[in-house]
């Protein structure tokens, strides 16, 4: 770490653009520009922002059956996903390079190399040099997410070294997996990213716990989603009728390494949460607790992580 001045970071609570990938990419570009002009050096967007998190949709499924209309809607969702690399990725590379920022964006990724049907919930890392530096695929989709997303493997437990410290993180309820969190801590993450689709109040306790446990800064980031944001011509839109008008109230927030609130949670609107991080607070906070250092017991506990890529056919 060579830069000891405060580091401004931004967590973007963007309004959802379901089934409208081009608009989502343009939102990434415009809100990145806004955050960069405010001095942000690291900018985080929510889980599944580009490609969409389909709140409230069941895609016409029930135990033991699927519907033709559900298949059509999944086809439309698949078309909303992006290839990595691909033209949408190139556009986000460009905006990161134009503004010289570290940019992290949640996307829905198509796997066109090994499968033409499987989607992944992915976090992309872009550098200020305008390059895609890496990606993380969600290891375990939650509940009905398993219907539409595949599972990532250990090869994308990505972290990125910046000039102000190592950045990495996990997506949504992966953050309830203790061994996954420990893997991030073991990689030396100082700024921990936790993009999510969970807008419950209690999610704030999770973010605060991660900050205290890892003695790291934590950026929690969610979308603001209203039923009216879905396209009018969406088939099976009646599946949304059982849900409230506001599908995700947000809750984007930033916490410090002693669990202190640095960026208050933002609710019921789109916006950007900022914080200025004193990176020296990391080692000061670890004076009495260092989860992979003096508070670890490798003689009692060990964690083995398989970071190899897994394919159905070798």
Where are these regions (language model features)?
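Hydrophobic/aromatic beta-strand patches that form the interior of the parallel beta-sheet core
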Residues: 10-12, 44, 104, 134, ...
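Cys-nucleophile CN-hydrolase/nitrilase-fold catalytic domain and related Cys-dependent amidase chemistry
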Residues: 21, 33-128, 198-200, 204-216
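Short beta->alpha transition motifs characteristic of CBS
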Residues: 51, 58, 124, 136-140, ...
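Short beta-strand scaffold segments in enzyme catalytic cores
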Residues: 105-107, 121-125, 158, 220, ...
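C-terminal beta-strand edge segments of enzyme domains
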Residues: 223-314
């Amino acid at each position: 770490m060579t830069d000891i001045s405060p580091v401004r970071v931004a967590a973007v609570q963007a309004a959802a653009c379901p089934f409208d990938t081009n608009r989502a990419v343009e939102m990434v570009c415009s809100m990145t520009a806004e955050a960069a002009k405010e001095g942000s050096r690291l900018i985080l967007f929510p889980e599944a922002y580009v490609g969409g998190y389909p709140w409230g949709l069941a895609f016409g499924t029930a135990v033991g059956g699927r519907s033709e209309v559900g298949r059509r809607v999944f086809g439309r969702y698949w078309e909303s996903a992006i290839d990595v690399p691909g033209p949408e990725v190139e556009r986000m590379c460009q905006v990161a390079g134009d503004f010289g920022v570290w940019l992290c964006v949640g996307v829905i990724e198509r796997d066109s190399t090994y499968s033409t049907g499987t989607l992944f919930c992915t976090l992309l890392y872009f550098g200020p040099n305008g390059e895609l530096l890496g990606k993380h695929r969600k290891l375990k989709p939650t509940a009905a997410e398993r219907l539409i997303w595949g599972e990532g493997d250990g090869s994308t437990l990505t972290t990125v070294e910046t000039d102000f410290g190592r950045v990495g993180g996990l997506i949504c309820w992966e953050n309830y997996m203790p061994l996954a969190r420990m893997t991030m801590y073991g990689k030396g993450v100082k700024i921990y990213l936790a993009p999510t689709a969970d807008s419950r109040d209690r999610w704030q306790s999770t973010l605060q716990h991660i900050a205290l446990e890892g003695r790291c800064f934590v950026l929690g980031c969610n979308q603001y989603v209203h039923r009216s944001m879905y396209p009018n011509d969406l088939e099976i839109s009646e599946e949304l009728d059982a849900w409230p008008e506001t599908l995700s109230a947000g809750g984007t927030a930033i916490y410090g390494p002693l669990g202190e609130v640095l960026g208050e949670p933002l609710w019921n609107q789109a916006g950007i949460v900022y914080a200025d991080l004193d990176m020296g607070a990391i080692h000061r906070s670890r004076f009495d607790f260092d989860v992979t250092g003096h508070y670890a017991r490798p003689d009692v506990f060990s964690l083995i992580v398989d970071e190899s890529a897994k394919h159905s056919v070798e």
